[in-house]
Curated annotation (Swiss-Prot):
Pfam families: Aminotran_3. The keyword Isomerase applies. Pathway: Porphyrin-containing compound metabolism; protoporphyrin-IX biosynthesis; 5-aminolevulinate from L-glutamyl-tRNA(Glu): step 2/2. It comes from Shewanella piezotolerans (strain WP3 / JCM 13877). Its cofactor is pyridoxal 5'-phosphate. Homodimer. It is found in: Cytoplasm. The modification N6-(pyridoxal phosphate)lysine is found at residue 265. This is Glutamate-1-semialdehyde 2,1-aminomutase.
């Protein structure tokens, strides 16, 4: 039994399932999770001392790589002044100004402590601003674990949402409508049925919780037009894509302007953080300037702001995103080439610094339905093969992979060499 195995058994006695977030339990791939002791650059090290090339990056925040010296220095400097004040600081003003500078659609921004808190607050604000109750989300997209968002589609195309978790009253879920990602007709049908009741559309501009599904041409623009037609707000959830897909997020990459944006992950530099912002007239509707209430004890925490600012400033350097995109393309296309060489069908998607691969005969994967039909047996086999080779991928076929600027040629080549060996074994059966 490894030290990670021992820690997992120990953890299950005091922590539900032994983890503090379900995907970490390895239920999607089987086996025991690796307990991580430290990380540096493109690498993580488990409790047994084994070293892995990391393509999870704490689920996206570590875009510069782990334990980056500039972020570490900023945090250590901030800690000298105290950990939390529960009062305004210059740091949070500077962070707000930096976010607004990088994302033109955000005229004002409110800091919170998590992505879930950001999306929950943005939806409350949209409902309050429009005086409408219903929201529209997409099947397969994840926006945190707020009650109104853990909802799946009903049995019919135009049915009201059904709770996807116990503990969510149906009275809450009935206000959440679920459409099909990359299908404008499904959105139009819901707006035609509820023309004056939908407060907002919330979506991942690149769906990173059904692996990695970019928007098809015209999809985001079509959603913008529908929102304008019916007076609903468009909320782009950039908790994952913000400052990972491009310097101005996915909205900048695809050229679409939302009314509200949610952020997290990258803006914290590895510390717990979230934010939501957008049009000034909408943001002025939140307390204390407006009637919609939102608050947070640790919102704008100075340590998180310091870490985030250090990371954001580094991301503003010339050539950063071109470099990141080139690395991501190289690794994704390398996976596909290695798989195809050994007769294993694979489709790939990639945008900016995130990628996904799918064990399927389909040439292109653009929908949640396609993702659910991928080979459910090949992914765990490939995952554990790569883990044994010292490559740490997301332990779920429904999660995107992430590159960092710390991934150099040596790491990329070692990863593809490992994939080549694993695919060769898979082909032999």
């Amino acid at each position: 039994m490894t030290r990670s195995d021992e820690l997992f058994e120990q953890a299950k006695k005091t922590i539900p399932g032994g983890v503090n977030s379900p995907v970490r339990a390895f239920n999607g791939v089987g086996g025991s999770p690796r307990f991580i002791e430290k990380a540096d650059g493109a690498y993580i090290f488990d409790a047994d001392g084994k070293k892995y090339i990391d393509y999870v990056g704490s689920w996206g925040p570590m875009i510069l790589g782990h334990n980056h010296p500039k972020i570490r220095a900023a945090v250590l400097e901030a800690v000298e002044n105290g950990l939390s004040f529960g009062a305004p600081t210059e740091l949070e003003v500077t962070m707000a100004e930096k976010v607004i500078e990088m994302v033109p659609s955000m005229e004002q921004v409110r800091m919170v402590s998590s992505g879930t808190e950001a999306t929950m607050s943005a939806i409350r604000l949209a409902r309050g601003f429009t005086s409408r109750d219903k929201i529209l989300k997409f099947e397969g997209c994840y926006h945190g674990h707020a009650d109104c968002l853990l909802v799946k589609a009903g049995s019919g195309a135009l049915t009201l949402g059904q709770p996807s978790s116990p503990g969510i009253p149906e009275d809450f879920a009935k206000h959440t409508l679920t459409a099909t990602y990359n299908d404008l007709d499904s959105v139009k049908a819901l707006f035609e049925q509820y023309p004056d009741a939908i407060s907002c559309i919330i979506l991942e501009p690149v769906a990173g919780n059904m692996n990695c599904i970019p928007p098809v041409e015209g999809f985001l623009e079509g959603l913008r037009a529908i929102c304008d037609q019916y007076g609903a707000l468009m909320i782009i959830d950039e908790v994952m894509t913000g400052f990972r897909v491009s310097k101005s997020g996915a909205q900048g990459h695809y050229g679409v302007t939302p009314d509200l944006t949610t952020l997290g992950k990258v803006i914290g530099g590895g510390m717990p953080v979230g934010a939501f912002g957008g049009r000034k007239d909408v943001m002025q509707f939140i307390a204390p300037t407006g009637p919609v209430y939102q608050a947070g004890t640790l919102s704008g925490n100075p340590i998180a702001m310091s870490a985030g600012l250090a990371q954001m400033e580094a991301l503003c350097e010339d050539g950063v995103y071109e470099q990141l995109a080139a690395k991501t393309q190289y690794i994704a296309e390398g996976f596909k080439a290695a798989a195809n060489k050994h007769g294993i069908p694979m489709a790939i998607n990639y945008v900016g610094g995130m990628f996904g691969f799918f064990f399927t005969d389909e040439e292109k994967v653009t929908s949640f339905e396609q993702v659910t039909k991928c080979d459910a047996e090949k992914f765990p086999e490939f995952y554990h093969g790569m883990l044994d080779e010292g490559v740490y991928l997301a332990p779920s076929a429904y999660e995107a992979g992430f590159l960092s600027l710390a991934h150099g040629e040596a790491e990329l080549e070692a990863t593809l060499a490992a994939a080549e060996r694993v695919f060769a074994k898979m082909a032999k059966g």
